Amino acid sequence: MTVALSLEQGAHLVSMARKTIETAVLERRAPNRDELPAWPEGEDGFLQSHRGAFVTLTNSDGSLRGCIGLPYPVKPLGEAVVHAALGAATRDPRFPRVRSDELRALTVEVSA
């Protein structure tokens, strides 16, 4: 049985994805764990639960800019979101890598 995300959990995952994308685009690397937003106290177990996750990027006009994910629960949720965010920004075969001048206009969505 899959447990739905709370609004706070969802917002936190989006913050993690955005930080991952910014680091990948601006510094051409994945962020270290300590560079990601801290998970709310008492909820770190949720971040460690194995879940599938997708990160979708859209432009300001609503057009797709990237989408990559893990459909199966093969990684802890935090790792899955970082993996999907990196993929959506840098490895979606339909699009070139996200550029630094695109970052401000991108909408980041996490599905888990």
Question: Model segments located where?
Answer:
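Basic nucleic-acid-binding interfaces
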Residues: 1-112
